[in-house]
UniProtKB/Swiss-Prot annotation:
Annotated GO biological process: ribosome biogenesis
Domain EngA-type G: 3-166, 200-373
Gene this chain is encoded by: der
Quaternary structure and partners: Associates with the 50S ribosomal subunit.
GO molecular function, one term: GTP binding
Classification via InterPro entries: G_ENGA, GTP-bd, GTPase_Der, KH_dom-like, KH_dom-like_a/b, P-loop_NTPase, Small_GTP-bd
Residues the record lists as binding GTP 2: 206-213, 253-257, 318-321
Occurrences of domain KH-like (ranges): 374-458
Task performed by this protein: GTPase that plays an essential role in the late steps of ribosome biogenesis.
Native source organism of the sequence: Shewanella pealeana (strain ATCC 700345 / ANG-SQ1)
CDD domains per record: EngA1 (cd01894), EngA2 (cd01895)
Family (UniProt): Belongs to the TRAFAC class TrmE-Era-EngA-EngB-Septin-like GTPase superfamily. EngA (Der) GTPase family.
Coiled coil: none
Positions of GTP 1 binding: 9-16, 56-60, 118-121
Entry protein name: GTPase Der
Amino acid sequence: MIPVVALVGRPNVGKSTLFNRLTRTRDALVADFPGLTRDRKYGRAHLAGYEFIVVDTGGIDGTEEGIETRMAEQSLAAIEEADVVLFLTDARAGLTAADLAIAQHLRSREKTTFVVANKVDGIDADSACAEFWSLGLGEVYQMAAAQGRGVTNMIEYSLAPYAEAMGIVKQEDGDDDEEEREYTEEQAEAEQKRLQDLPIKLAIIGKPNVGKSTLTNRILGEERVVVYDEPGTTRDSIYIPMERQGREYVLIDTAGVRRRSKVHETVEKFSVIKTLKAVEDSNVVLLVIDAREGIAEQDLGLLGFVLNAGRALVIAINKWDGIDQNIKDRVKTELDRRLGFIDFARIHFISALHGTGVGHLFESIEEAYDSATRRVSTSMLTRIMQMSQDDHQPPLVNGRRVKLKYAHAGGYNPPIVVVHGNQVKKLPDSYKRYMMNYFRRSLKVIGTPIQLRFQEGGNPFEGMNSKKLTVSQERRRKRMVGHIRDKNKD
């Protein structure tokens, strides 16, 4: 399970700076749900060999009068759901009453907490950080988030105990190695068989009260009741194995399966972290949207995280029964307008309460999973790449035409196509999008995003003395030397 790291501290201690550095511009802000999360931000990060979800808890303004009355409810929830808490302090400002109040709350929650003294650049760090030991939360880690000094070591130091306890294997930190991976035909076939033999992990997600519990009950059968919100279970989703028409599934339920009577009595508890962790751990995501409410910003935020995670996607527009035809037409128009960027995903109009259209969901779920794990040979990918060049040549870069050499599979779920060539890193985004769409159409990929990665061809003269003559220059030099010698003899 991917760990969750919460950044906690009073305002202006550098939480947002650290958040931006951890998530990087390409991962950036994943979800910021108005009205639900208030000042919480969520991002995906990969650093020091670990993948994790990082949460910026925002405006925690603790005072000596009592942290419980000053901390926002959402920030408290972030601390409760986190696996590791990084308590940021300001080494320049020193220890404050707000720091003491926050520390008291963290001690009472018995969370795995690491004190981080930020802004240590340009000062006597050891002297400035000495007073933070009085917080009683263990060692004080020094860092300068704005400059990036100490960030990687701090993440490794804080996540290593959790990773060891959970059996998480540390990965080699380096995107290039992952991008350069090339499957042999035997490896590709073995990987596809392995994926096809595994149960499909299906995460059912959506904002509160869109019918996730009702849909899960409908899929599992009315008689199936799973207890939810027992002590100790609020942080993690429920994993429910099931079988349908000979195919095994594992439903990752983020809402909890309640008795039908209680679905209408209790406002569904929404946990952003629980949802994001379920997406990370799934193969296919089923996003449930309320037809009566249309596409909300929260839905788009969840879609953004699904796309960033590279997960296969099926969309269910729930509560479709009983809606006036004019409203249905308006909803379909809105779907075309706002969801045009995910035209690869199947959209189903269902009624979880009455079961209308629910059975057809699994056709699209299996189709999406099969597309995400399908084996495609190097020769096929190279042929498609060549056809895309024939139809639309790559642009000129510095007066030279970008040359694409070959393509191969770089991974599954999502499908990754690695294209090798000269100057490929300089290809404009418009041409990369053209190639991605060309591969999608040619491979008939449905229900899953497809990723293209580009690798520069090796330079055979790299590392050689730049003054060394070429073969033709060497021949010319010999002719000139011979000519001079003959002339001198005369």
